[in-house]
Amino acid sequence: LEKAVDRLFIEADRAYRDGANILILSDRGVDDNHVAIPSLLAVSALQQYLVKTKKRTSLSLILESGEPREVHHFATLLGFGASAINPYLALDTVKQLIDEHMLDKDYYAAVDDYNHAIITGIVKIAAKMGISTIQSYQGSKIFEALGIDKDVIDKYFTNTVSRIGGISIKDIENDVNTLHSAAYDPLGLETDVTLDSKGRHKMRSGADAHLYNPATIHLLQQSTKRGDYEMFKQYTSLVDEEEKHTNLRGLMDFEYPKKGVKLEEVESVDSIVTRFKTGAMSYGSISKEAHETLAIAMNHLHGKSNTGEGGEDKDRLTVGPDGKNRCSAIKQVASGRFGVPSRYLTSAQEIQIKMAQGAKPGEGGHLPGKKVYPWIARTRLSTPGVSLISPPPHHDIYSIEDLEQLIFDLKNANRDARISVKLVSEAGVGTVAAGVAKAGAQVVLISGYDGGTGAAPSSSIHNAGLPWELGLAETHQTLIMNGLRNKVRIETDGKLMSGKDVAIAACLGAEEFGFATAPLVTMGCVMMRVCNLDTCPVGVATQNPELRKRFHGKPEYVINFMRFIAQEMREYMAKLGIHTVDELVGRSDLLVQKHYPEGSRESKIDMSRILNNPYALPESHEKMHFVPEDVFDFKLDQTIDETVIIPEMKEALAKKQKKRIEINVSNLNRALGTLFGAEITRKYYNNLEDDTFVIKCNGSGGQSFGAFIPVSYTHLT
């Protein structure tokens, strides 16, 4: 393969000398005796060669290949240098679908639809990266490689980030030969060029491994339903076996000391589960029944459930007549600000600013119009039947200073709530997290790429974001280096499925842990992946009243799952000689890379950036986890609300009397009125008349003047 790529360079030089200005790379010549060079390798290698020899601006690079078929394929080919792409096999497949009457459409119309879908996906990817023209995107190499050797990167994908090493050019050659042999029998006895599904998008027997498969789903549901811990251990045993081949933590193991501690000496299940949270799944994306079941379960455990970005029905903000607390402890604030009035914020124990989403990095939320039923629209303060899309960036955040302002606003809106910022695991997230900590956030959430969202297109889910193991380790280490680790809690999520997963996350720096897909599975989710279509057959991810009748989940199932995870985590802690979760946080020295046979693919992965943390020693442990006394001081006692407005209005507020005052303000008075507005909301919600409290402001108020104030409170300027 290496010689074949070198031959490409020679042929390109010859064509250039002969006066060619367009080079076409084609794999149509594949037959019994000719194996194709992988299209991305060919394009990127030739691009790098032409750039180095200063010929690229004189030549266009066109690819004719049967490989590209999905949005990501086209995006990487363009990003690594292709000028144009002819996906002939994808187009032949469209024709075959029409010929076999599986697609009732004119060929040219069908091809046009296919092209439109691909182009829309490419444009979306470019937009996520802040790029507005395809010319700027071509050759930009804005990717990170996972599992590719440094020599391959340096020679063929120059300057592309690749942090964990991986397969060599020889391994790639072996893969190509294996695929070729499957189509063309080496003995010449049989030729079978039909395409085979690898089960990448949906589970297929004998194809790609999926962590959630019929066996694991059955064991998880039955064990949590019955409260059977031994059956749950069967589930985690299967998961741990599958993880060996599917994610980075599967390549790690614990380095146990000669002597552990007794299980009774380890932090209790009741204490550990308070660190657990459910993921940000909005009311609208999942059903009322599913959303409330999660809240009831987590409140029972003294953990935290998350509203997602869809607001929360006001009837849930107080304990119901049945004595159950359906109020989500975490209230999310996303770029669309759907359903974020003052009462929503004042009812929170934690307010989460969603800067990004692990399951679809670079994109905002999207609730299709068919799922925006009247009751959803009412909660989100929107219009029934109209799709709700959160823009990828927050319209008011373009710097750390802007983020600091929003954090300050939200702290004023609820002085008792922790402020959390959700980030995606990606290269450089540690630097961003350091800025977030300096801006005053009390929790930083690092969200991994393989958290599941059924409400996003596959191009948004696959090949976007990175494993939480990389982002978490980077964030933890960067915060320590900047003297900020003790000021913030670190949380992580992204397909945490077992006590071992959680223990590894703690060793890499996490203090709190989020679960989303697993709790849904315990409530009945069967991974149909039709969440966005409003057709969920088990009533979990639908607003259809008839389908919701099929929901049979119970809080007890989620409670059992969380307690089982904590119990299994305790067992690992006992073997490691660890008494509390705080002792475990950041102890990457307790993790080792598993040993694999020399030359195997697993042996080529380099985990040193994740595991070799110079601060991961017990004696340096003081600043390695959150210290409550070191939390950011917002100096709320010095605000104009605390020093002037609340003292002036205190008696009128207590007696519900109308009152008007006049004050002098300046642009130093940020979030003016927000603290007092929160006091009104806590005491009376929206049950006071308009203009009950009026403040005449002389001068110019600062940023976020009157943010989140209720209707009974008015500022006059």
Label each region the model flagged:
Residues 1, 74, 105-330, 348, ...:
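Flexible, glycine-rich loop/tail regions that form catalytic "lids" or insertion modules at the edges
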Residues 714-717:
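Conserved small/polar residues in nucleotide/adenosyl-binding loops
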Residues 21-27, 88-93, 301-318, 420, ...:
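Glycine-rich phosphate/pyrophosphate-binding loops
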Residues 676, 682-686, 703-709:
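Short, T/G/N/S-enriched strand-turn elements that build extracellular solenoid repeat scaffolds
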Residues 1-5, 62-68, 281-287, 393-396, ...:
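Active-site mouth loops of central-metabolism enzymes
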Residues 48, 52-92, 96-143, 148-150, ...:
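Phosphate/diphosphate-binding loops
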Residues 9-26, 32, 48, 52, ...:
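Alpha/beta enzyme core
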